């Protein structure tokens, strides 16, 4: 269910990701396979948007006053994966990878001195852990908690697809501003 398309293993170099290597969504299948394949398609899309860029280009921010960058999106989505799959669904107490600074701001979008290779490694390892948690879940009805609220795996997968799709829209614009590359 989580295998990469065309034999490309997960954890492959994000700089080499192409459209042909993205995991294709399941078009006819059960709900779990459909949701997990669409989520993986969105993850692969983020990798594709970052492919072929230099460290400087990955750190390049959108127009002021936004601090948004492709590298910031990768780091943010690592945090989102951690939060929903490990902390909420799996009940772990895993602290942020990119903790708050002295001003109390989350630092995933502060990429001036961030190491892209390390950031991608964190994201890829977090995605692998998320896939393992999903694979181990008995059903989409399994729940986790955040505060007093319960969340099903079904909801979390749908939310993660929405989260990636929204940020991949940002990634489209960022990538086009960097080098003119556009595409799905």
Which residue stretches match the model-derived regions?
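Short, contiguous alpha-helical
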Residues: 2, 9-24, 32-104, 145-184
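Acidic/histidine-rich alpha-helical segments that form the ligand environment
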Residues: 105-144, 154-160
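Active-site rim elements
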Residues: 30-35, 115-117
């Amino acid at each position: 269910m989580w295998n990469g398309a065309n034999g490309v293993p997960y954890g492959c170099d994000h700089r080499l990701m192409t459209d042909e290597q993205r995991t294709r969504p399941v078009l006819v299948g059960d709900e779990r396979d459909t949701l997990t394949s669409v989520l993986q398609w969105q993850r692969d899309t983020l990798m594709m948007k970052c492919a072929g860029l230099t460290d400087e280009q990955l750190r390049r921010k959108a127009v002021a006053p936004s601090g948004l960058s492709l590298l910031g999106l990768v780091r943010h989505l690592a945090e989102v994966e951690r939060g929903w799959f490990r902390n909420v669904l799996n009940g772990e107490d895993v602290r942020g990878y990119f903790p708050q600074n002295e001003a109390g701001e989350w630092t995933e979008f502060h990429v001036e001195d961030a190491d892209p290779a390390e950031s991608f490694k964190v994201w890829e390892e977090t995605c692998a852990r998320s896939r393992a948690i999903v694979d181990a879940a008995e059903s989409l009805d399994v729940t986790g908690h955040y505060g007093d609220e319960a969340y099903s795996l079904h909801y979390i997968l749908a939310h993660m697809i929405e989260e990636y799709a929204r940020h991949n829209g940002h990634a489209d614009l960022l990538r086009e501003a960097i080098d003119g590359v556009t595409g799905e």
